[in-house]
């Protein structure tokens, strides 16, 4: 069978996607599959690369360009294609895409339209989970605890910033965190200690999205639960992000690889169980399928607050999601195989 590995993308998380794709390429079972590379450039061009039957020798195979003339064709050149040309009979798409235009339902909807099976969550779950505001409103209805928050629209901010300040400061206490509603991997996130910083943080968040969310800052540990399955949902024991900074940013998480993890997290058994139950409930409520990672805050009083649910978590070989499953006895290559089978079962 052919796996179409779709990676790159137009979002700010383009580079994370390339790292994740390389990890998948090195772990997939080539005795069962061939892998067709399809790269989406930062400006949205789709480039069909080589068909691989074995592990690549280096990462350069992923950095595709397209030739304008036959003379320009090089070792890592690809063919520029229209998105619909991705369609193939008896193939499955593995979209290792993060952030907007990747895990927000857009690619998923396109795959549904051309009737191709794909790994991961469907349109509804992807769209809802990508939007931090929508996630919070939906999960409130099933009683999953979350920190207090204030949604802010860019139009309201431009029209009456004073009212936005008053709303935020009337509901929350500094420090707060400001985030774009539709972005991941700590992109566009700021910790804020006063009104002046709040103004700067909102301007930064609105660079990435027309909607932002302001959340109450709390002293807490960060623990994460990995989720796997369609109707039969499984969860891992929590892992913990161990850090010595105010919050870990995009570079720390992916580029510099400076995040320290504790797997499993050192938490009471009842806390671990509660985190697993909340993660499963959130996954089911959002109509999850395939995979997700659910992130929580854990206070010194062992109170859990759901932070977010990621339908396509970082998938590098040093990312939390695969490491959590490895701790449960499911190695990376077998995890990839299970995700492929879950996708095929969903499309039967």
Curated annotation (Swiss-Prot):
Keyword Ligase: yes
Subcellular location: Cytoplasm
Keyword field: ATP-binding, Cell shape, Cell wall biogenesis/degradation, Cytoplasm, Ligase, Magnesium, Manganese, Metal-binding, Nucleotide-binding, Peptidoglycan synthesis
One Pfam family hit: Dala_Dala_lig_C
Domain ATP-grasp: 136-341
Cofactors: Mg(2+); Mn(2+)
Binding site for Mg(2+) 2: 308, 310
GO cellular component, one term: cytosol
Binding positions for Mg(2+) 1 per the UniProt entry: 295, 308
Catalytic activity field: 2 D-alanine + ATP = D-alanyl-D-alanine + ADP + phosphate + H(+)
Recorded superkingdom: Bacteria
SUPFAM superfamilies reported in the protein's UniProt record: Glutathione synthetase ATP-binding domain-like, PreATP-grasp domain
EC number annotated for this UniProt entry: 6.3.2.4
Gene3D superfamilies for this protein: 3.40.50.20, ATP-grasp fold, A domain (3.30.1490.20), ATP-grasp fold, B domain (3.30.470.20)
Annotated family: Belongs to the D-alanine--D-alanine ligase family.
UniProt name for this protein: D-alanine--D-alanine ligase
Species: Enterococcus faecalis (strain ATCC 700802 / V583)
């Amino acid at each position: 069978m052919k796996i179409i590995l779709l990676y790159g993308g137009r979002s700010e998380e383009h580079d994370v996607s390339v790292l994740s794709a390389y990890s998948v390429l090195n772990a997939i079972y080539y005795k069962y599959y061939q892998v067709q590379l399809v790269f989406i450039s930062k400006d949205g061009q789709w480039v069909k690369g080589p068909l691989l039957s074995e592990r690549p020798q280096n990462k350069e195979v992923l950095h595709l360009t397209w030739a304008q003339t036959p003379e320009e064709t090089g070792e890592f050149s690809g063919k520029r294609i229209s998105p619909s040309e991705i369609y193939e009979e008896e193939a499955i798409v593995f979209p290792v895409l993060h952030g907007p235009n990747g895990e927000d339902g857009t690619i998923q909807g396109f795959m549904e339209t051309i009737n191709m099976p794909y790994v991961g969550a469907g349109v509804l779950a992807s769209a809802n989970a990508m939007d931090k505001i929508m996630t919070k409103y939906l999960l409130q209805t099933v009683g999953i605890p979350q920190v207090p928050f204030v949604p802010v629209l860019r139009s309201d901010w431009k029209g009456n910033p004073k009212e936005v300040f008053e709303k935020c400061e009337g509901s929350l206490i500094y420090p707060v965190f400001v985030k774009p509603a539709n972005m991941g991997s700590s992109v566009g996130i700021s910790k804020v200690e006063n009104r002046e910083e709040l103004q700067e943080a909102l301007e930064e968040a609105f660079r990435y999205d027309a909607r932002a969310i302001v959340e109450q800052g709390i002293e807490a540990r960060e623990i994460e639960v990995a989720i796997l399955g369609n109707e039969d949902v499984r969860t891992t024991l929590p892992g913990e992000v161990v850090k010595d900074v105010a919050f870990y940013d995009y570079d720390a998480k992916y580029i510099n690889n400076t995040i320290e993890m504790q797997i499993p997290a050192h938490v009471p058994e009842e806390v671990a169980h509660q985190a697993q139950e909340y993660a499963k409930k959130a996954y089911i409520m959002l109509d999850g399928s395939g995979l997700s990672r659910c992130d929580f805050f854990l206070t010194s009083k062992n109170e859990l607050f759901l932070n977010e649910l990621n339908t396509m978590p970082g998938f590098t070989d040093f990312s939390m999601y695969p490491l959590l499953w490895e701790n449960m006895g499911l190695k990376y290559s077998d995890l990839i195989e299970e995700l492929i089978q879950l996708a095929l079962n969903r499309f039967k």
